[in-house]
């Protein structure tokens, strides 16, 4: 009888631990709701004043769970790169999504487009877990997380401090930390010498889509990158752009072309993720902004620039 009571108590403790893990202050932990948005947990555990993680490992993690050393050194053999590429996955991962009360809108990009920002990297705690497009994250492969780039976009990452570079394929969403533009795998972070520092100022250049590097970058790729990268990436016919936009805005209509072009130039300079053009129709020069993923995204743009803009479907 005593053994049965102990067993019941033990199961009760396990249940309570599980409940506490899943919920905190009555709110379901995001990692259980959507495991792939793992960078959100990083954001909550990051202290911007000390620039250090506030998260402390529990007893089990400290003494039993395998971790790499502070330099991220780990000689374990890599998993299969495992790219998932289908129209269904592409459509699903271009939908707007919300993290921490903020909406993110995957949007169109063009071949050769450039972006500047701060890169970080993620590794052991997420190795072998699912990414946003359903792949298994492999910290030894050249992949990365980005908040809005289409899945399987191939990007060159340049560390502007030392001019080293690498190539990655986007297969995850994040990092959901202020001022971060991309979250690199351990392998990619090593290529540009940022593992120890943790972050680096980078420039991103879009090289291709669908996991394929465009032929126009073939010579540079063959001359400058290692055999490892040549095993992971191939050069071929790649689309010139990928667009998920379904909505557009007419921001103004002018009889004078100069006035229309002035507004278009201003909007384009301030909004690199959208396509802004001037179209002549019905004897008017109309300023159009294209590339919105949802009506909500377009209306947010209207609130910022012009409440009277005309919303249309592309």
UniProtKB/Swiss-Prot annotation:
Residue numbers with lipid attached (N-palmitoyl cysteine): 20
Gene3D superfamilies for the chain: RlpA-like domain (2.40.40.10), Sporulation related repeat (3.30.70.1070)
Membrane topology: Lipid-anchor
Domain SPOR positions: 241-314
Cellular compartment(s): Cell membrane
Endpoints of the signal sequence: 1-19
The protein's name in its UniProt record: Endolytic peptidoglycan transglycosylase RlpA
Organism: Helicobacter pylori (strain J99 / ATCC 700824) (Campylobacter pylori J99)
Gene responsible for this protein: rlpA
